[in-house]
Swiss-Prot record:
<dbReference type="GO" id="GO:0050661">
    <property type="term" value="F:NADP binding"/>
</dbReference>
<dbReference type="Pfam" id="PF05173">
    <property type="entry name" value="DapB_C"/>
</dbReference>
<dbReference type="GO" id="GO:0019877">
    <property type="term" value="P:diaminopimelate biosynthetic process"/>
</dbReference>
<dbReference type="GO" id="GO:0051287">
    <property type="term" value="F:NAD binding"/>
</dbReference>
<feature type="binding site">
    <location>
        <begin position="177"/>
        <end position="178"/>
    </location>
    <ligand>
        <name>(S)-2,3,4,5-tetrahydrodipicolinate</name>
    </ligand>
</feature>
<keyword id="KW-0457">Lysine biosynthesis</keyword>
<feature type="active site" description="Proton donor">
    <location>
        <position position="171"/>
    </location>
</feature>
<keyword id="KW-0521">NADP</keyword>
<keyword id="KW-0520">NAD</keyword>
<feature type="active site" description="Proton donor/acceptor">
    <location>
        <position position="167"/>
    </location>
</feature>
<dbReference type="GO" id="GO:0016726">
    <property type="term" value="F:oxidoreductase activity, acting on CH or CH2 groups, NAD or NADP as acceptor"/>
</dbReference>
<keyword id="KW-0963">Cytoplasm</keyword>
<comment type="similarity">
    <text>Belongs to the DapB family.</text>
</comment>
<dbReference type="InterPro" id="IPR023940">
    <property type="entry name" value="DHDPR_bac"/>
</dbReference>
<dbReference type="GO" id="GO:0005829">
    <property type="term" value="C:cytosol"/>
</dbReference>
<dbReference type="InterPro" id="IPR022663">
    <property type="entry name" value="DapB_C"/>
</dbReference>
<comment type="function">
    <text>Catalyzes the conversion of 4-hydroxy-tetrahydrodipicolinate (HTPA) to tetrahydrodipicolinate.</text>
</comment>
């Protein structure tokens, strides 16, 4: 570890389940310094972010809902590396959050899913013009990246594939960003999957799931008791090949989050996907 000043970090969505894990991980990383904790929930205003995350000692960083003043404060810190904001908020607010951060020269690391392709392109253009690094990562789990790589390899040999993603019932968007990204990676091969051999009729609309690119179907499940799970199921005459990743604890995302915080400072534009920085 060098003697360089620690990276100043803001966590947006700090009172949420992922936000609390991020606060805890940052507090335990000697090269990172939590300067701000943002959350819109009224019941958490003024509470210490460390105590809320379950740390034994307070961090003396109070939860606030004032994003712009915090961005300005961190941007005004001229000593040490530029600031980073980690966003685990909501699909309705993440786009504006990221634009505001880039405008202040703060590097966004975005774990919130639900951004449309057009929004991602707009943010990419904005980051490019500002020469500011930005990372949008649908899934911070290294295990999920390995699953996606295995799926790309398998899709060269199988012509039929469907994706099932399962999440807790507080997740706001469907399908998950990870499932969409997985389908996009398979579609990049340029082949069409799941050529129909019969004319299908959905007796209930949506029964066959949502249709992604190149004929790939995604099925979404939302239930209490789940965290985050994904299956990629390949089929061929006489065989089924299933890839599955299960998240049992949100701590599995933290190595990817910390890596992204450190890597985003080296970027001058928007990068999409954890696999691009491994």
């Amino acid at each position: 570890m060098t003697n360089q000043a620690p990276i100043p970090v803001i966590v947006n969505g700090a009172a949420g389940k992922m936000g609390r894990e991020v606060v805890k991980a940052i507090a335990q990383a000697p090269d990172l310094n939590l300067l701000g904790a943002i959350d819109s929930s009224p019941e958490h205003q003024g509470k210490d972010a460390g105590e809320l995350a379950g740390l034994s000692e307070p961090l003396e960083v109070p939860i606030t809902n004032q994003l712009e003043p915090m961005l300005g404060y961190v941007a005004g810190e001229r000593q040490g590396p530029p600031g980073v904001i980690v966003d685990f908020t909501h699909p309705d607010s993440v786009y504006d959050n990221v634009r505001s951060a880039i405008a202040y020269g703060i590097r966004p690391v975005v774990g919130t899913t639900g951004l449309s392709p057009a929004q991602i392109q707009n943010l990419a253009d904005f980051a490019e013009k500002a020469s500011t690094g930005c990372l949008i990562i649908p899934n911070f789990s290294i295990g999920m990246v390995l699953l996606q790589q295995a799926a790309v390899t398998a899709s060269q040999y199988f012509d039929h594939v469907e994706i099932i993603e399962l999440h807790h019932n507080q997740k706001a968007d469907a399908p998950s960003g990870t499932a969409i990204q997985t389908a996009e990676l398979l579609a990049e091969l340029g082949k069409t999957f799941n050529s129909a051999i019969v004319e299908e009729t959905e007796k209930i609309p949506g029964a066959r799931g949502s249709l992604a690119g190149e004929g790939i179907r995604i099925h979404s499940v939302r239930l209490p008791g789940l965290i985050a799970h994904q299956e990629v199921i390949f089929g061929a005459p006489g065989q089924i090949y299933t890839l599955r990743h299960d998240t049992s604890d949100r701590a599995c995302y933290m190595p990817g989050v910390l890596l992204a915080i450190r890597k985003v400072l080296q970027l001058k534009s928007l990068v999409y996907g954890l696999e691009k920085i491994l």
